[in-house]
Curated annotation (Swiss-Prot):
Lineage: Eukaryota, Fungi, Dikarya, Ascomycota, Taphrinomycotina
Protein name: Alpha N-terminal protein methyltransferase 1
Family: Belongs to the methyltransferase superfamily. NTM1 family.
The protein's enzyme class: transferase
InterPro entries cross-referenced by the UniProt entry: MeTrfase_NTM1, SAM-dependent_MTases_sf
Native source organism of the sequence: Schizosaccharomyces pombe (strain 972 / ATCC 24843)
């Protein structure tokens, strides 16, 4: 796989997607899926309150933030400030307009090129974006996240998971990884899984979606 083409093809694809909830969710944004997704994420974060609930003035990062759907409906419910990290200019511009009155900052960069500030975050949320990183860049990115979270901080991953083997999609230039691959990459980034769960309520024809809470091995 040519990394440069892998990344440029993904940006080309997303540049052609409308900056709407329906666009962010691949045409599934008008039914029950958006709310089901939000409820699942909030419920998962409630399980982590024993860690992140102890952090005053929690700052969160919404990685692969799109138009800010997760920031608005999930992260701002628990965070005093959210940094939205998103490589697609049209999406980040839309997010700025929709969240203009909210305590948010906007970072227009791909995760493979983002170096988060050390010890800034109580929560780094990654949803439907890590499939757009190569294995090497994913390990490096998660390693940087390790240094960016505070003592009680958590890195969360919410991604599609394939059943048997990693699956490349040439349409949006993404790799849906199997659980074994994901956990191997987490381990290589010196992260351990402290909580995980399956997202319920999504159509059976879609890939299963899993949530993982990760902390540095020494935590």
């Amino acid at each position: 796989m040519d990394p440069e083409k892998f990344y440029s093809d993904a940006i080309d694809y997303w540049n052609g997607v409308q900056p709407t909830v329906d666009g962010m969710l691949g045409g599934l944004g008008t039914g029950r899926i958006p709310q089901t997704d939000v409820v699942g994420s909030r419920t998962f974060l409630n399980r982590l309150n024993y860690r992140i609930g102890k952090i005053e003035n929690l700052v969160a990062a919404d990685c692969g933030a799109g138009i800010g759907r997760v920031t608005e409906n999930v992260l701002l419910k628990i965070a005093s400030h959210v940094d939205l990290v998103e490589p697609v200019e049209n999406f980040i511009s839309t997010a700025k307009k929709q969240l203009a009155t909210k305590p948010c900052s906007f970072i227009n960069v791909g995760l493979q090129n983002w170096t988060p500030e050390k010890n800034r975050y109580g929560l780094i949320w990654n949803q439907w974006c890590l499939s757009h990183l190569t294995d090497e860049d994913l390990i490096a990115y998660l390693s940087r996240c390790c240094e960016a979270i505070q003592e009680k901080g958590v890195i969360c991953v919410k991604e599609n998971v394939s059943s048997f083997e990693d699956t490349f999609d040439p349409i949006d230039s993404s790799v849906t990884r199997c659980e074994q691959s994901l956990k191997s990459l987490f381990k290589k980034a010196n992260l351990v899984v402290v909580a995980e769960t399956l997202q319920h309520g999504f159509p059976e024809e879609l890939f299963p979606v899993k949530m993982y809470a990760l902390v540095p091995h020494s935590s």
